[in-house]
């Protein structure tokens, strides 16, 4: 039985991770959970999964949660100290980093030093501190398993070919809700329009960033660090159907890709069970039902966030 801790348990990735764990309750135990301040949902998770430690960000939320869950006897920590306690909880084997932003850097570093396997959904950790995280993981012999669907697809496409040089990574993008529009078409869009992703169910920040291709730019940086490739070896391909989640082209011209339905539980479960696979409920990919698979070059004139991300990655450093 693998023992799992989750940073960001009440967010999109966190709740889907717990869904996978619930489906395979005989294989996993939840040891520690952390969230922002959504104590109502965290309380539900505490009562269902019975972790041995939880953390919330604010002292006020923690005080309220302690009262609400006094009958459980589960310690409630706060702030960065709480995140670090969850990240390094002694009994945990895998840490799922599903919080948003640079807040994930310190807990990830601490977890690596505590020799926890990292299931990485917090791309900002590598975007801003990949030059620290990757060498540190190598030093401590810690695996970093990608949870982002695209990076999981690349990771899976590399299995069994680790010694074979690659030509390039084909990083797919759906194009978001505004694919095909030009600058003048985007002057009066509303937040609710940007939150209507055509294929994926994700948190609000990632969904907004996907609508501008900024998220894809961050994924380019993440791929650079995860797979040790040059920026010139990462090619973004707009693939509106989101069936091919990404691919790797090898030096001989062969392309190996990972296909599947747009369900984040797939890469989550792959990371939790790695290197094994296990049955997962849900819709299967039906090749006969697919009308077509199409591919386009990204419109970097309209969606400048992607080209800006490449420029930032070339310069390196932080602002």
PLM ranges: what are they?
Residues 1-319:
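Catalytic, metal-anchored helix/loop core of enzyme active sites in primary metabolism
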């Amino acid at each position: 039985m693998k023992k799992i801790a989750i940073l960001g348990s009440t967010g999109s990735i966190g709740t889907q991770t717990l869904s996978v764990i619930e489906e395979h309750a005989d294989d996993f135990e939840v040891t520690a959970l952390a969230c922002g301040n959504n104590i109502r949902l965290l309380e539900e998770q505490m009562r269902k999964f019975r972790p041995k430690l939880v953390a919330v960000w604010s002292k006020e939320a923690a005080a309220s949660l302690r009262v609400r869950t006094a009958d459980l006897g589960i310690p409630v920590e706060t702030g960065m100290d709480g995140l670090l306690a969850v990240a390094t909880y002694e009994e945990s084997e895998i840490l799922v980093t599903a919080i948003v932003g640079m807040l994930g850097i310190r807990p990830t570093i601490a977890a690596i030093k505590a020799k926890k396997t990292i299931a990485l959904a917090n791309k900002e950790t590598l975007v801003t501190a990949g030059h620290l995280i990757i060498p540190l993981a190598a030093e401590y012999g810690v695996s970093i398993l990608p949870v982002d669907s695209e990076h999981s697809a690349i990771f899976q496409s590399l299995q069994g070919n680790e010694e074979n040089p690659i030509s390039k990574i084909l990083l797919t993008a759906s194009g978001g809700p505004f694919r095909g529009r030009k600058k003048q078409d985007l002057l009066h869009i509303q937040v609710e329009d940007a939150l209507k992703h055509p294929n994926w169910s994700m948190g609000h920040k990632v969904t907004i960033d996907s609508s501008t291709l900024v998220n894809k730019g961050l994924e380019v940086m993440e791929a650079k660090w995860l797979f040790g490739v040059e920026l010139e070896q990462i090619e973004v391909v707009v693939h509106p159907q989101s069936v091919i989640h990404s691919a790797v082209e090898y030096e001989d011209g062969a392309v190996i890709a990972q296909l599947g339905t747009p369900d984040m539980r797939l890469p989550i479960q792959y990371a939790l069970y790695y290197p094994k696979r296990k049955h997962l409920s849900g819709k299967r990919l039906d090749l006969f039902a697919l009308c077509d698979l199409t591919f386009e070059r990204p419109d970097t004139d309209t969606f400048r966030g992607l080209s800006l991300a490449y420029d930032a990655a070339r310069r390196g450093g932080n602002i």
